[in-house]
Amino acid sequence: PDVPSTNQWAMDWLKSEAPHRPILFTADHQTEGKGQRERQWHSERGRDVVMSLVLPVQPHWTPASLNKRVALTVRSTLLEALPGAMNERSVLVKWPNDVLIWHGAGHYKVGGILVENVWRGSAWSHVVIGIGVNVQSRRLTQPYRAISLSDAWQSSVSPHVLVEQLAIRLIQDLHQPF
């Protein structure tokens, strides 16, 4: 489906729900994708990762440690999803939320992460982890250096497969104490 924003969809859903298990929101396209400081993130229908994962807060989490762990998990998942295309220095996270890949003579933005906290009264109850990755985009209109995985490494990874890999890894990694 098309949605304005998977994070907004998840946040709206959480107003009436309080899941005790992970819930994944994904779309073929979002029309009002957002990043830090209300910046827009553009995607092409069916060609990019557009997802938000809702997780109940775990006792061992703190907001700062969670953000760092999410970023490192996204980075390692991209490295694993594209074997042979990258080495350890090919993917980095520019704090707090930009995912960059090396191409040619520099780093280009390939995706972003937006972690939003949900509070019930004074209790931190859930997080919404929004992730966008340029997988097969051709129209990258951001005002900064952006690239897609397919343009950088002629990757044929499916956005749907990458969504599944990201969701599984995040659920596994964030469940473990860190």
Where are these regions (language model features)?
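Long, positively charged amphipathic alpha-helical accessory segments at protein N-termini or as interdomain linkers
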Residues: 58-91, 101-178
